[in-house]
Amino acid sequence: MLLKLITTIFLLTCITLFGMVGCSLIERMLLFYPTHRPNNSSLTPWIRNGEIIGYSRKVESPENVWLMLHGNAGQASDRLYAVPCFSGDDSVFILEYPGYGNREGVPSKESFNRAAQEAYLFLRETYPRTPVCVVAESIGSGPASSLASLTNKPDKFVLIVPFDRLSLVAEEHFPSILIRLILKGNWDNVKALSNFKGLIEIFGAKEDTVIPVRHAKALAATVPGSKLVIIDGGHNDWSYEGRVEIRNP
């Protein structure tokens, strides 16, 4: 009885909030946690049309070019920790999402997907004879997977602690009725990757409590030809101790 009462009060509170601030704002509050700090890392600003759209570690004549899509918290310049996971012969470009760091815009599924596509096509244009691959962590696997719909597809995907469908993960943390009401940006990686025939490597973390490893396993099971690797640690531990090596092939 007490649980029912608490649930009822919670739902009534949410409905009141919907009327006050709208579902889109609540969705942003639940999904996106941007920071807006200056870049104090050794990463170099990545500039397109006079705007900083991310940060990079560039090498001369790279063997591969990687577009990295980070998770839902922090900002692109925080991701210096990921650079040692890449080959020293590859260039790495870490996209800044709209509304994150010093980039203008509002975080949403649509703005993330659009920014990812623009950045990817910009890299294709900049490096026309070099393989362009995509690596993503956590929520970044959503906009990353959307790139599989392009005509000129990525040469490889590496998805780290990804989800299969965002709604399924959200329902593990919040009541299902709340998710159905507010989750408009429901990335479906299973659907997005269903017709992709290229290389896909998927890393799931055994002790992940944010996106439990079963979601990485479910995604791998539905994507023909994908390679599943299970690593130790939790959601944010994948870059430790060489657990993930990001390579092509």
Name each model-derived stretch.
Residues 53-122, 142:
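Membrane-embedded segments
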Residues 158-168, 188-189, 233:
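Active-site nucleophile loop of the alpha/beta-hydrolase fold
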Residues 135-140, 144:
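Gly/Ala-rich beta-loop-alpha elbow adjacent to hydrolase catalytic centers
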Residues 196-197, 201-204, 208:
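Short beta-strand/loop motif that positions the catalytic acidic residue
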Residues 234-244:
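Catalytic histidine-centered segment of alpha/beta-hydrolase-like enzymes
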Residues 209-215:
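Conserved alpha/beta-hydrolase "acid-adjacent" motif
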Residues 9-56:
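An N-terminal hydrophobic leader/cap segment in hydrolases
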